[in-house]
């Protein structure tokens, strides 16, 4: 049988998990393609806050955070009904999660930041922590995507500062400072708003509300750029 196209691996979907698997399959020697049923890529990963929960990740370790595999294990077991998750899956998540982040950091454009004040959902549970397990993507200038920028699914309105025509992106760390009106929030807002206004000509040129991509958009953009470096295509609708 003759095919129009031939690939070793076809990845269906274009969220964080799908694009990460595409990177790994390519790096493992497989000819890879990503297909997305809609006319935009990124899925719910793009609209989300972009956070990734990995205990004992490299970014937390760089800040000498006090955590352990046992604490992570105790926490996961405390928030899941007994027997709901197989022990081997929990062990794999705890042991391989940090390795995945290491691989992406060292072999792609995917970079994260430690969220030192983003607590586990149940921090008082056994093994729970007040922060340093979740990460968010490093912001990135969206114009580096070129025409693919227009195909990136937009962030959820709640993950940006919106007022009339103004739609200004912020990171989770910045959002905590701004929404909580914590010390320094006025200075931060003035800085972000000034950059936003001064960038108006370029934003109008690219047809994008804010070229500074953060949260889920930043994570997807970095994955897409990493696939572009590998000449792996993403076919949309």
Walk through the language-model features, giving the residues of each.
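A conserved short coil-to-beta-strand element within the FAD-binding core of flavoproteins
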Residues: 236-237
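Extreme N-terminal leader/targeting segments of oxidoreductases
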Residues: 1-9, 27, 221
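Conserved N-terminal/central alpha/beta ligand/cofactor-binding core
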Residues: 37-233
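N-terminal Rossmann-like FAD-binding beta1-loop-alpha1 element of flavoenzymes
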Residues: 9-34
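Generic cytosolic/nucleocytoplasmic N-terminal low-complexity/intrinsically disordered segments
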Residues: 1, 15, 105-106
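Short coil/turn connectors at secondary-structure junctions
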Residues: 5-7, 28-31, 48-49, 230
